[in-house]
Amino acid sequence: RMADVNGFRQEFPAEYVNTVKNMIEFYANICFPDYSNPCFSDAKLGDRPAEIRNYQEWLKLFPDCDWIRYYATEGREGSPLPNLSHGALTSGFFTFRNGWKQDATVMVVKAGPKGEWHCQPDNGTFELWFNGRNLFPDSGSYVYAGDDEVMKLRNWFRRTSSHNTLTLDEKNLQTTQSVTKLWNPEGNEQILVTENPHYEGLKHRRSVFFVDQSYFVIVDEAVGDAKGTVNLNYHLCEGTVNVDDKSHILTTAYDGSSNMKLQCFAEKKASMREKEGWRSTAYRVRVPRTSVSFDVDKKDSEAVRYITIIYPSKNAASFPAFKAKFLNKKFDENGVKIEISVDGKKRQLEYKL
């Protein structure tokens, strides 16, 4: 912008200008329809008017860009990005999306390479927006740095178990170097398969299926010789959540028409545990929320495997009944095959690498 004002834009190569535009495009792809952004790592929750002003400034740089115009004018002019789901494979951010308006379903998954100080050890975590509400917001950062008491608070929000991912004995990840095994953003069974060497002796493979562009099936596999308690952690937004620890079911009862049902099916005996849950909405501001983990005692080298169905719905009064099971009887490096049932309608989901 300053180069334009001073008449020096031509001094910058086209590649540089394209890089700036690509950065804007990446940001648009990971944001939700209300212009808010995922609060991964040390990110702050964006302010809608400020974000719209940003797009208005960017439109001055790229006046012929239809999709920047769309976001700068709140959809009154231009057109949205031509894609729905989007993967940034180098940085490891993946978006499942069925639309650009308020009633859209949008999941953003963070599964990239090692980051530095501002990056939290949260590989495999996600946020999920549905019909105007972020149902699984990140814990955020709460505070940055200070004395021992301040760092205790910071470390609670940045720790791995405060995110929507898998841990062993609730310990922070030793390695944060996710590898994308498969990314298919098209069709009625969109798939992401990502793998991270969480700990010495234990890797985590997470496979996400976006089914019929309406609900999600997540397969988590903890593989290796390490022993301990495997925890599959989920953190919901604030509000009323009904917890059925016997059936491993969470159903939300939020005001409005954005709710969901989650049910976890563990291959081995598992216990569902409610635990302390918070999310930070601004610096030094936090609100309580429902947080749970599904715990499995891992005593040997056999993989610990889970299937989770997350079903967003506008109607909190009635959710479908779920069943799920693995069809491949043990962990397979080359793929997975499962069967799910939604209100009695069976369906097989699978991939091969």
How does the language model describe each region?
Residues P137-S139, A145-D147:
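Cytochrome P450 core scaffold surrounding the K-helix E-X-X-R motif
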